[in-house]
Amino acid sequence: MSCDAYYCSSRYSPKRKSWKKVIHLECGHDPQDAIFEIDDGVVKEYQSFILDRLTVDTSELHKPLIKFEFSSLIQFEGEDEETYEPEVEVDLLFKLERVCNGVKECLRSWRYLKEFDVEDPEERDNLELEIEISEPFTVIFCDKNICPGCCEYRMVVEGKDFEGEFEFLRVVKPVLTALIQGYVSCDY
């Protein structure tokens, strides 16, 4: 039997690529509370903590997209007294970092700033301010600029600026999750 054009096209079709959407969920695998060191009421400078991390492998994915969600609880107790203008301030910087092939990159940062102050406009009376806070801090970020391969993503918090005397300052119950969407090749 000879292979003519009709016979070949009706009996044989070359494999074509099709794409199947896949979605994965990754959860952080090493959550750590950030307990800031305080010396005689003063928060020590330059403290940084990795709150949670996760690993994502996009090497088999076409057009990967990653949606990150991070949540935590920020807690502090601070005071300022014996001044006509007492102030308590907490300034934290949260950073989502990606580490691929040993190269670290900050994808996005968020600032948490809480400032309380009262004042005596006549500057005669010494006032006192005491604050105790426990509130959630949550962020969402989508990453589209993804290089194929295995990368670690981590959420970091840094102490930036503080006013007042503190009993404690901490970021607790950190949770980092990622939804990974992409397409895998399906030959048929």
Give, region by region, the residue ranges found by the protein language model.
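Extracellular jelly-roll beta-sandwich "head" domains, especially the C-terminal globular C1q domain
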Residues: 2-188
